[in-house]
């Protein structure tokens, strides 16, 4: 009887195996291209407030970050990217405490915050409190029991939008690419002309006298933005209605004739207000850098 039952079991197993061999594996159904796939959330808006000034940044379709209040502003997006990196890393820091009294960290009624919004319109807000050893105490809204000490964040949201401007680069002017230089101060005008690598004025070789000036001309830089899209009265406030000195340069670049006009106005802190050619933005240039030009304007070629 046992042998008969065993044979019957083996026969049943063989029949099941033969039945399986004749069946084809059903192919996996491809994804329907007409059904939209869920996109991974990515940061698209960043808002920060230091308690008195609020700055808003937005990520455009090309991936670049702009100042949301005026997208024509020439933002140096490295500032926004650095802030974004800091904010995204907050909750990877070790918490200061898991049972914090917010008042102990200046967080009870904080007006300083950073809000990050992603492409699915989900927002996270972090509140900033008091400083400690170069860091600021932070908690995430909705998770107030956990406080973090975040380095550098307070300084990052304390900048003005002008501090974040991508400043224009000025041309490098040398005896090889300059056609002529004109320095005007009040009623005095001085024209400098390059000749075979040297500088002349009224036919005289003044190369040695212009050593400091020519070194600066080859390495001119703007220090900061003072006023972008200034109002009608800004020129007078910055001393640009009666400039201390104006430098006009005719030069060539990539085979084309170019010109540069640098207008130097009044002093502000450690620098002078300046404008560049047709750009009405008021910039700051350091007094140290401008010293050779100002000396030439005041004393001439003695």
Regions found by a protein language model. Give the residues of each.
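A short-motif feature that recognizes glycine-rich, charge-decorated loops
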Residues: 21-302
């Amino acid at each position: 009887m046992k042998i008969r039952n065993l044979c019957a079991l083996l026969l049943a197993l063989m029949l099941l195996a033969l039945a399986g061999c004749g069946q084809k594996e059903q192919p996996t159904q491809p994804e329907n291209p007409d059904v939209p796939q869920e996109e991974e959330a990515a940061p698209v808006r960043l808002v920060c407030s230091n308690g008195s000034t609020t700055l808003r940044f937005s990520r455009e379709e090309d991936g670049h970050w702009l100042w949301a209040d005026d997208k024509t502003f020439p933002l140096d997006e490295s500032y926004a990217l650095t802030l974004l990196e800091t904010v995204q890393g907050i909750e990877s820091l070790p918490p200061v405490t898991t049972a914090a009294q917010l008042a102990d960290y200046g967080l009870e009624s904080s007006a300083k915050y950073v809000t990050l919004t992603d492409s699915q319109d989900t927002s996270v807000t972090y509140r900033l409190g008091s400083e400690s050893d170069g860091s600021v105490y932070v908690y995430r809204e909705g998770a107030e029991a956990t406080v973090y000490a975040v380095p550098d964040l307070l300084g990052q949201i304390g900048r003005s939008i002008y501090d974040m401007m991508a400043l224009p680069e000025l041309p490098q002017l040398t005896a090889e690419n300059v056609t002529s230089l004109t320095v005007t101060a009040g009623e005095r005008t001085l024209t400098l002309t390059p000749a075979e690598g040297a500088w002349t004025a009224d036919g005289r070789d003044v190369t040695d006298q212009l050593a400091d000036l020519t070194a600066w001309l080859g390495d001119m830089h703007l220090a900061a933005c003072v006023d972008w899209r200034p109002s009608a009265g800004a020129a007078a406030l910055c001393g640009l209605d009666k400039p201390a000195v104006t430098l006009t340069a005719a030069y060539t670049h990539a085979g084309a004739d170019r010109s540069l006009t640098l207008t130097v106005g009044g002093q502000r802190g450690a620098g002078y207000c300046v404008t560049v050619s047709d750009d009405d933005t008021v910039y700051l240039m350091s007094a140290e850098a401008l010293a050779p030009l100002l000396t030439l304007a005041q004393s001439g070629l003695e």
